[in-house]
Amino acid sequence: MPKKSKGTIAILTGGGDVPGLNPAIRAATIRANRNGYRVVGLRNGWEGIMKIDRTKPVEDQQYCQILTEGNVQKIARTGGTFLHTSRTKPSKVAKEKVPEILHDKYNADENDLTDEIIKNLEFLGIEYLVPIGGDDTLSYGLRLHKAGVRCVGIPKTMDNDVPGTDYCIGFSTCVTRTIEYAHQLRTCAGSHERFLVIEVMGRYAGFTALVPAMAGASDRCLIPEHEFDIERLTELMVKDRRDNESNYSVVLVSEGAMFGGSEMTFSNQETDDYGHKKLGGIGDMVSAELMVRAPKYNKGEPIHTINQRMSYMTRSGQPDAIDSIVPMAYGNLAMDLIMEGKSGRMVCLKNGRYDHVPFEVVTEYEKKIDVERFYDTERYRPHYHNCMGMPQFIMTSD
């Protein structure tokens, strides 16, 4: 006779994909199954649970999948998310995005479908929800927690800017890829004796530029937390090139970096469901300005640039070692909390130790680089000293 389930846990992934999501899904599923829990994977993030059709039996739902040790065993070897994802915000759904089955009930220009989300979770028999995502996904998890849904969150974003944790799934692979590609591009920059300008993702925080720069990926780096003077940058880049036997220099540019007195650069004016515009293009502008100004510091001779936007390359492919190990620990820690009956918590790393914090932390402040401690505002590069006693993830502690 089959054992009675201790309860049903649902897992979903929201926001951008990163390597490391699948190891977290796998770890939580296996731990849950081995302890008598039933696990449901909710496909396509908040969009999927929003589209549940309560007129159909659970086994016929397009956006649900029963997760077992058998069907998650191999997923940790792959990047992205096995459950797929979306950037949907259920509390702010445009009329044209309301599921067809709900058209009669929700026909305003902007609709809050939170009541439907809660009813759908109840329909599926979900007793615990594990959302894996960044501050947007987790802030909506907080909304559900306040409405009575038992939730335990797992932080994920290559930007590493979720408040309350030193580390978010996807960050290490992003840093690893950035360092690898920057070193590979050096062969081109050196062969042609050029400036190498590399733009990286990161939105409003500069961790994805600063940490690779600390590891030697570039001579200089530009971050959103501190405006830069293009004239000063040009002078430094020319000097770096002159001091390099191969006659080239490298700058990492966070997509949110800003010229002095200007605003962030957006690739277009469209916004996602959370109101975010798509950043991008600052690397192009820096490249152009460096070429214009370089002769002034190079005895009148021009210096050409190689301009490379990393974009999705740093969030694609298999996870690195850290993004295989930390997600495994996060998935297990989430299950620890569930088995202890705790809710409204986000698992985290604090000062190098696994821990958990209240969900509310996600919305209380913005996580940024501590410029005074870790950034040289005169030389546009990482600044650090006396690492004794600091956590493993230097510069990202929160």
Give the role of each language-model region.
Residues 26-35, 55-66, 143-153, 169-173, ...:
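A glycine- and small-aliphatic-rich helix-loop capping segment at beta-alpha/alpha-beta transitions
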Residues 32, 37-123:
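Glycine-rich nucleotide/cofactor/substrate-binding loop typically near the N-terminus or early
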Residues 108-113, 119-122, 128-133, 141-143, ...:
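Accessory alpha-helical/coil subdomains and C-terminal extensions
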Residues 164-173, 318-321:
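Short beta-strand elements at the ligand-binding edges of bilobed clamshell
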Residues 2-56:
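N-terminal phosphate-binding or glycine-rich loops at protein starts, especially the Walker A/P-loop
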Residues 36, 42-43, 145-168, 222-229:
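Short, acidic/small-residue loops that bind anionic groups at enzyme active sites
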Residues 267-398:
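C-terminal non-catalytic interaction/assembly regions of soluble proteins
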